[in-house]
Amino acid sequence: ELAERGFVTLAPAYPHLAQYRPDWAALGYVSGTMKAIWDNVRGLDVLEDMEEVRAGGVGAIGHSLGGHNAIYTATFDARIAAVVSSCGFDSYQAYKDGDITSWTSSCYMPRLRDYALAAIPFDFHDMVAALAPRPFFASAPLRDDNFKWQSVDAVAAAARRVYALYGVEDRLSIAHPDCAHDFPLEMRERAYALFAQWL
């Protein structure tokens, strides 16, 4: 859909999904998340070298795993000028009522196991705040059984204070479609409109 709208698109595979199976430990990575972030950053390097891509006009969009990886990558790389996350996050403390087991697999962030839940040194409110003043849109469905929309709102409320310091609170927006763990057309259209405005 983005390509049909004229956007140059790159959709990197996540480590150990589909056919992409790098040995991230042998490559020096502790987690699949950091390998994915590095792959995404290298993808930005490729896009940056393409004459078809406008300088400063790169966005990140993703659903579920792609949704939090859009946030992670944009936190590490300011070349991403706008970010969209669908069903991609809530706070670690709210996730599955505090059971972060799935976040601690080697595919994600195994070092989270080293911390008590309340002592994890970062959470999504920190990462979303770090995106400011860049535009950020999150679709957090009312019936998502993975990420709680109420927690998404709490994350956004905390991050919005940083957006306010920049005087751009309106650049952080959240929507709650009445669906399950999905990225419905109405939300995708809203995401594409954000990209059309900012990229």
Label each PLM-derived region with a short phrase:
Residues 17-20, 67-69, 90-95, 137-138, ...:
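Flexible loop/turn segments at secondary-structure boundaries
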Residues 27-35, 60-65, 71, 114-122, ...:
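Alpha-helix capping and helix-loop boundary segments enriched in small/acidic/polar residues
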Residues 157-158, 162-199:
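C-terminal catalytic histidine-bearing segment of alpha/beta-hydrolase fold enzymes
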Residues 1-49, 94-99:
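Cap/lid segment of the alpha/beta-hydrolase catalytic domain
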Residues 41-44, 128, 156, 160, ...:
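Generic structural signal for well-ordered alpha-helices
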Residues 5, 42-118:
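Primarily recognizes the serine-hydrolase "nucleophile elbow" in alpha/beta-hydrolase
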Residues 134-140, 173-175:
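Catalytic His-Asp charge-relay segment
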Residues 82-128, 133, 142-156, 164-168:
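Mobile cap/lid helix-loop segments that gate and shape the active-site cleft of serine hydrolases
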